[in-house]
């Protein structure tokens, strides 16, 4: 047994592991640093396709994987946060963003003459500095910076290990023969690229390994071109797998990614094959790591430029491939489950959890949606009482069912998000959101209780006096404004809105006490029937409790603002 060969194989395997782990740590740190900016970037998608491309490129540059970005897009489309037209731009941009890693890796080709400039020279120092920041720094931002630095250091150490383990064998005939076969057979090269990328689940990682081989001068241009084209197609595998069990549109998003990359590979692969036929010297030229970076970037930018005007065509093609359900299938699906529960299950798509910062933003967005449902229920219940409206009573019951489902799904989702790798600040937000959904659900319960009183009022033909109706209108309007401001404070993280809630809640308490005393006077003077009076006082009490829950929401926001200071 050749001990040296075994040792080099171990070194190569360790190098791959270190490279992949370093890239993962670096991406995780960058993603945490990006935080809620992810949500703002997604908001830009509604403007135009060019901005969507830029956003896709930026997000992928952060998370270092076009496949991961597309998985996130599949999750957004599945949850109804993004249309297919918006998604196609992000998918195109993702292919550009993933080339950043290739440029970082290409720095490793700096020669021994300038060893002091080689990233691997500084890699151990980077790991050391990063580890100190992660282990001993108390500030979250410094810890994130430490993760990024450690990741970069490990990435370059891994590349150096791989390069060093291969260097003794660069003159071996097996390398030249292997790349000669791959270069002369485009389909084989593309297949190798697809398989390696599918296994590693990252085109950035597979391109990095190819560049390591190129640094040692064993990769021919034709082989590199075809393998790179395959790597682009291989990056689609992650999204395709993740689209299983999603909506038709989510499957179409994954399909568009595949169509886009296959189209690019066909166009460039055909062109490259023809070029190499007329320029055989170029085909067998040993490509450098930097040249792979140039080709990788050039290929993706040109493909995006060519295909961008045909984004709508990609959407149509994906619709032809992934057809709508037939009417019978749709009916069977609806009969199988609660349609609103099915819709909510798509809202809380587990694919979004792969991007923790986005998952946190999604949690907040869903809490706001739940809050607005409870706000609607306050309005419905007030209308039911004021107008003896049976339709409004039915609406309250329907909305309360939705709020209960939201509480169930949101609680499960928040538990999952809280277990992700998120910042301390995000953990505090998630804990407050747990409290928020309890208050929001209780408000909807109170609305249902008030609708029960409205039903009792209708069935027993109870009529409030004109004074009583005016008093209820005045109090209910304040409660609606109070809860609306509480939702605004939670959504916008607004101190002004939170202070408004506290002020209005005090006014509600004072007004409720005043109206209660006035009504007791009317009961004492015989202007109101005792049976009517009990219902009226119960409604006052319910409205006051609703404002208490609004105040709880505002107090959480004010506490978060104080904590930040």
Model-derived features with residue positions:
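Interfacial loop-to-helix junctions that mark the boundaries of transmembrane helices
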Residues: 1-10, 110-122, 145, 176-182, ...
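Helix-loop-helix hairpins and the membrane-proximal interhelical loops
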Residues: 1-49, 148-195, 213-216
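Hydrophobic core segments of alpha-helical transmembrane domains in multi-pass membrane transport
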Residues: 11-24, 56-60, 126-137, 150-162, ...
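Short helix-coil transition sites and intra-membrane helix breaks within transmembrane domains
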Residues: 16, 27-31, 60-68, 164-167, ...
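Cytosolic, long alpha-helical scaffolding segments
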Residues: 82, 108, 219, 245-251, ...
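Membrane-embedded alpha-helical segments of transport systems
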Residues: 62-69, 88-104, 120-126, 155, ...
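Hydrophobic alpha-helical transmembrane segments of multi-pass integral membrane proteins
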Residues: 46-72, 186-209
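Membrane-interfacial helix-loop connectors
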Residues: 72-94, 102-122, 197-234, 243-249, ...
